[in-house]
Each structure stands twice: as structure tokens, then as C-alpha cells.
Amino acid sequence: MAPNLRKSHPLLKMINNSLIDLPTPSNISAWWNFGSLLGLCLVTQILTGLLLATHYTADTTLAFSSVTHTCRNVQYGWLIRNLHANGASFFFICIYLHIGRGLYYGSYLYKETWNTGILLLLTLMATAFVGYVLPWGQMSFWGATVITNLFSAIPYIGQTIVEWAWGGFSVDNPTLTRFFALHFLLPFMIAGLTLIHLTFLHESGSNNPLGLVSNCDKIPFHPYFSLKDTLGFMFMLFLLTTLALFSPNLLGDPENFTPANPLVTPPHIKPEWYFLFAYAILRSIPNKLGGVLALAASVLILFLSPLLHKSKQRTMAFRPFSQFLFWLLIANLLILTWVGSQPVEHPFIIIGQLASLTYFTILLILLPITGALENKMLNY
């Protein structure tokens, strides 16, 4: 019998083992769709980004007008830009839901997969940040100034690092050109990290909602989950195109319709919605260095998840107290996101401080203690 090319060809067999004959737990729910949706987001962003880059000029005098030109004069330029800008929001929605799934179902116990996932999140955040600067509107400029300035809080070398990042003594032309270079490069780094992420995942196989070893009950990825993923693709692309066509500026900042002006500071500098929770944590600490450390800790705390898992059960499916804390954490993050969008005044300052404290308390103290208590309850 002739060998099956799909299984024998050096390249095709890699694709086959990853996407076709991959043994997959039969009971994974729709929460396992977000990995493939993130892949779709990445492909969409790279394609729309390449098309935008062909019409973009990375120069302070021309950047704003080149973006305007793309929207007004390029065939479907407005659509490509709207898809790219809102595609970033969907990228973050998917990655946050993906991380939430990982926390709820104990996927972080696959340590290598989890750690590469956090690196992917950090790279995505860096990509989104440098990308937001490129249209060179007011919020682009001042957002870049405020966030890069945070590095000056690092003792001794901080100011040098900031000036080195800026390529001068303020955010100017050298900053814009290097940010464009980084924004072009980083998505391909994300693509490379994604392959590493998948390699580690396929070493262990997927987790499942019960958190049990599912080797006795696995089915091929294709056609079952390839079809399920396709449904997810259609649903997400429908939502993305709906947003891009009906309300493209819903999630943007009106300040960005004004070209960057170093002499006029916007009344309220704030990042895009997907960074607001971290921005609220940064603002909740009156000390600059303390705020920067809290900001870093808000994301890097995810590295500790495998070490803080004290339960004998992997998932939260049968742990009602941990479930309550998990949803409390989600509500807390939504409060932080809302506070981050508000001005720095009473009562938002105290709400932000309490929400920041609660965020770290739940992750570092309450969840591990609850896990240990639930173990005790299993004995009775």
C-alpha cells in the first residue's frame, strides 16, 4: 500500500500531527476555542498591518497625514485601518478570555506552555503600545511620553534608559521611526513564540474541563474541532466586521483626531481600554517607583500561578469557594478597568486603591488558602 503523504512528508506530517490527527480530549468546551481565535487575530492583524504599512510614513511631519490619506484616498483604506485598530481590541478580548480559561481550569500546571503564554501576552502588550503611537495623534504622543517616562523611575539608570529609548530628550522623530520598526517586527516574534507555545502544548496534550487525564477518551482534531473552530472564526469575524463597519471609533480616543502637539497636554491621558486595569493599578500608588513595580507585578504575577496552586483538584469545576473568588477577581478587574478610564479625583482614587489591593490579595493569598481549605473539606 502506498504511504499516506499526509503522514510521511516531512512538512505535511508536522501539520498533520498539529491540526489533523492531533488526539484531542472529547469534552473540551467552547472555552478552548480562544487559542485558534488568537491565531486568526494574529493572521488578520499581520495582513491588515502589512497593507497599512505600504501607505504609512514614519515621520512626525507626515505620519498623521499619511494615516488620513490612507482612510480618504486608498481603496478600502478606511476599512483596512478600522479592521486593524479594532482587531487589536479583539486580540486582547480573546487573550484575556484565554488566560481566564487557563486560571479557571488549572491549565497553568503545564508550566512551559503557561510561561510561553505569558511571554506572548507581554509581547502583544508591547506591540499594541508601540502601534498606538504610530498615528501620531494627541493621545498617541502623550501616551508614549507618559508610559516611556515610567522607566525613569528605575534607580540610577532610569533616565539614561528613557533617553536611549526616545533617541533624544523627548518623544520625537527618532522615537516614531523606531516604534514603527518595532511594531513591524514584534508580530513575527509573536508568531514564532506561538509555535513554541504549541510545541510545549502538544508535548502534554490539551487540558479539559474536568482536569482529568483524558488519554482513554481522545478523538482526532479534524473534523470535530476544526469545524468547531471554524464556527468560532465566523462568529468572531462577524463581530469584528460589525464593529469596524458600524462603530469603528467606539473604542478609540477622540483626542487622536487631533495631530500630536507637544505644547498642549490633553486633559486626561489614558491608554486604550485593554490596558486600563494595569493603568489603574499604576495610578493607585502615590510613589512613582512603587507604581511602576505594581504595574509590572499586575501581569508578572501570572508566573506565580503554578506555585500558588494548593488544591488537590486541578480545575475549579468542583470547587465552589474558589469559583466565587475567581468571579470576584473578574469583577475586580472590570472595576479597575472602569476606574482607569476616570479622572484622578475622589472617589476614583480610593476605589482604585481598594480594587488594586483586592486584586493582589485574591491571587496571592485568598486563592491558595481556599485551595488548601477545600482539600481539608474533602476529608469530611
From Swiss-Prot:
Keywords: Electron transport, Heme, Iron, Membrane, Metal-binding, Mitochondrion, Mitochondrion inner membrane, Respiratory chain, Transmembrane, Transmembrane helix, Transport, Ubiquinone. Heme b b562 binds at residues 84, 183. Its cofactor is heme b. It is found in: Mitochondrion inner membrane. InterPro entries: Cyt_b/b6_C (IPR005798), Cyt_b/b6_C_sf (IPR036150), Cyt_b/b6_N (IPR005797), Cytb/b6-like_sf (IPR027387), Cytochrome_b (IPR030689), Cytochrome_b_C_euk/bac (IPR048260), Cytochrome_b_N_euk/bac (IPR048259), Di-haem_cyt_TM (IPR016174). A ubiquinone binds at residue 202. It comes from the Eukaryota. It is a multi-pass membrane protein. One of its GO terms (cellular component) is mitochondrial inner membrane. Coiled coil: none annotated. Belongs to the cytochrome b family. The cytochrome bc1 complex contains 11 subunits: 3 respiratory subunits (MT-CYB, CYC1 and UQCRFS1), 2 core proteins (UQCRC1 and UQCRC2) and 6 low-molecular weight proteins (UQCRH/QCR6, UQCRB/QCR7, UQCRQ/QCR8, UQCR10/QCR9, UQCR11/QCR10 and a cleavage product of UQCRFS1). This cytochrome bc1 complex then forms a dimer. This is Cytochrome b. The lineage of its organism: Eukaryota, Metazoa, Chordata, Craniata, Vertebrata.
